[in-house]
């Protein structure tokens, strides 16, 4: 779950920007897209291969 605490002198726009970045980094939207639609075995293989490549980079 992405969580952002807003500071006293921080604007809403910058907090929203940080929240969007945290959501994209956590991969929440990609999970939602995957759950919403049927995933074929080929798509599942490609997704897992991409996850493996990402984890190797870090």
From Swiss-Prot:
Residue span of region Disordered: 31-58
Keywords, ordered alphabetically: Ribonucleoprotein, Ribosomal protein
GO annotation terms (biological process): translation
UniProt cross-references to InterPro entries, sorted A to Z: Ribosomal_bS21 (IPR001911), Ribosomal_bS21_CS (IPR018278), Ribosomal_bS21_sf (IPR038380)
Keyword Iron found: no
A molecular-function term among this protein's GO annotations: structural constituent of ribosome
Compositionally biased residues, Basic residues: 45-58
Gene Ontology terms: cellular component: ribonucleoprotein complex; ribosome
Domain of life of the source: Bacteria
Entry-linked PROSITE patterns: RIBOSOMAL_S21
NCBIfam families named in the record: S21p (TIGR00030)
Family from the record: Belongs to the bacterial ribosomal protein bS21 family.
Name used for this protein in its record: Small ribosomal subunit protein bS21
Organism: Prochlorococcus marinus (strain MIT 9313)
